Swiss-Prot record:
Family per record: Belongs to the PanD family.
Required co-factors: pyruvate
Single GO BP term: pantothenate biosynthetic process
Protein name per its UniProtKB record: Aspartate 1-decarboxylase
Pfam families from the UniProt entry: Asp_decarbox (PF02261)
EC number: 4.1.1.11
Cofactor note: Binds 1 pyruvoyl group covalently per subunit.
Underlying gene: panD
Any GO CC annotation of this UniProt entry: cytosol
Top-level taxonomic group: Bacteria
UniProt pathway: Cofactor biosynthesis; (R)-pantothenate biosynthesis; beta-alanine from L-aspartate: step 1/1
Protein species of origin: Desulforudis audaxviator (strain MP104C)
Amino acid sequence: MHLKMLKSKIHRATVTGANLDYEGSITIDGELLEAAGILVFEQVQVANLNNGVRFETYVIPGARGSGVINLNGAAARLAVPGDQVIIMAYSWCSESEVREWAPVVVLVDARNRVAKVLAAEGLPPLNMTGPEK
């Protein structure tokens, strides 16, 4: 059995732009992509904290250190500059891999700069057996 697990997320980033006339995607600062381990053209889910909308798109890289989080194409209708979003990437894992699985969480500051990275070694592994007794 394989399970779809959170691979990484960029938490509470601020949308910096929306470009309806672009072909589609989300542009993300290259430093944020690197910190989160998200690849160019990788599918991501975006959750808008301001309006509750969730949608999927793919990633294109923005200038490193720019703080850019730009929604392009149809996604530009789902958020406005200033909205806060969570950007999540997923990975398929075997049941044995899940036992030691922990995602990378990138926390950002108000300018979408990396504030802190909680890597797999910084988070507890998923307890598949339930709460400790």
